[in-house]
Amino acid sequence: DRCVFIDDVGLPVTPEKIGIIVAKSLITPESNKVLAGVPCSMILEDEIPKIGGELIWIRVGDVFVCEELKKHNAALALEISAHFFAPGLTDFIFDDPIIFSLKLAEYLHKTGSNLSQLSRDIPSYPYEEMKFSCPDALKFKVNEYLTDFFSSKGYKVETIDGVKIWLDGGWVLLRPSNTQPVMRMFVEAMDKPGLEKIKSEFKSYFDDAVRAIS
């Protein structure tokens, strides 16, 4: 139920870039919304409006994605885990890697483009995912603590799924796993030094939250 893509020079292409490319042939005036799981790259915020789309951040998970697709009459949805949904191409709403791959191939054929060039035309930013041990009995309490803490500090906070904090030049998402005793941290920044700074700062916030609750 997933698909990953390697370009014509042997390099992997991120799900976000694939979503942007395929969206060019799926977005219509009647259905221009693109849904993305909150851990996805901020390149979507820059690139989707350029092709006439409206980006909506959503919660991770197939059930939630399908509900949001119906709610918004969206053209497509994607997750960082390489799940892609294109409801206009299938009789039912589900993540169909085969038809999405065919749609990409069709776009490349019609435009005479190669995937490596299309990928290079879209910016890339340093991105990292980490996970920290956190007992099941604590992880959701930690999430609530961090949400309150960051909100009180005046950060721009998104709480669709975990707590996502928007920063100057990047963002960080702290999200309790639904299946494991861990908290995951996703970080993206405009450059590598910025990424390392965010990682260090927000890992400390996580450690402080665990100590405060334990």
Regions found by a protein language model. Name each.
Residues 6, 28-214:
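Phosphate-binding and adjacent anionic-ligand microenvironments
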Residues 2-19, 44-45:
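Short Gly/Thr/Asp-enriched flexible loops that form oxyanion-binding sites at enzyme active sites
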Residues 11-29, 33, 59-60:
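Short, acidic/small-residue loops that bind anionic groups at enzyme active sites
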